[in-house]
Amino acid sequence: MVAITLPRVLWGTKSAPKHVLLVHGLGSSAHTMWQLAEAFAEKGWCATAVDLRGHGSAPRTSTYRIGDFADDLLLTNPTHQGNWDVVIGHSIGAASSVVAASRDKDWTKKLVLLDPALTVGPERRQMVIDGQRYSHDHLTEDEVRAENPHWHPINIQQRVSAPKQASRFALEQAVLDNTDWNTESHAAALTIPTLVVGGDPAVDSMFTGSHAEAVLASNPLITHTVIPGTGHSLHRDKPQETLEAIFSWLV
């Protein structure tokens, strides 16, 4: 599959001394990373968020393997054409970033994975595809607000608009094309400092149990922290706490 050029949204100035790339999860968009991007820009960074293939205003394609997402990300470089100071990915965006970083050791200096979907088994795969179909076809702001009354109003609105802006085919194929959804070997091959910021397993997390233990044991460069009381969308549940975990690790 041919890699594509991903559309970008920037916060801060291109001449900033440090550059962060933000990679959204399935059914989201570049704009859904706004709170993280804004916080980095306020600290003097240039924050770039992209629409993954099939999402937002990105080109539509015929395949949506994690390797395809990774190929697109490897074509995504900072405006100064160097490497990223840090790449932050959520869910499948995190898995794709892991694959990209394992393929090109100079792509980014550091990696932050927000509740990464590194391995997804059959039961969870079905939950994901059912949820994506419902979000694309039926989800309303009232539903999101009732389930997440603590979310910022912008996040509520974007939780509804982003999956509808994405290609329904892309949302389905991102699950169906990845019949063996397992990027653990790529995580083990990482050669850069990597932080996993996980959701609370008591709420909902895709990085937990024996899977998380195996990933952490496979690579001493990977560290793990959990934001209590958050689910899979921890950057929406508790954005400030998520940012504090990231910035304290980056120091």
Residue ranges and their predicted role:
Residues 98-102, 107-139:
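Flexible "cap/lid" loop of the alpha/beta hydrolase fold
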Residues 198-230:
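Conserved loop-alpha-helix segment in the C-terminal half of the alpha/beta-hydrolase fold
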Residues 9-59:
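Conserved HGGG/HGGXW glycine-rich cap/lid loop of the alpha/beta-hydrolase fold
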Residues 190, 196-198:
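Short beta-strand/loop motif that positions the catalytic acidic residue
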Residues 42, 46-88, 230, 244:
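Active-site loop/oxyanion-hole signature of alpha/beta-hydrolase fold enzymes
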Residues 230-239:
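Catalytic histidine-centered segment of alpha/beta-hydrolase-like enzymes
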Residues 123-127, 136-189:
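Conserved alpha/beta-hydrolase catalytic His-Asp/Glu region
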Residues 89-93, 97:
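Gly/Ala-rich beta-loop-alpha elbow adjacent to hydrolase catalytic centers
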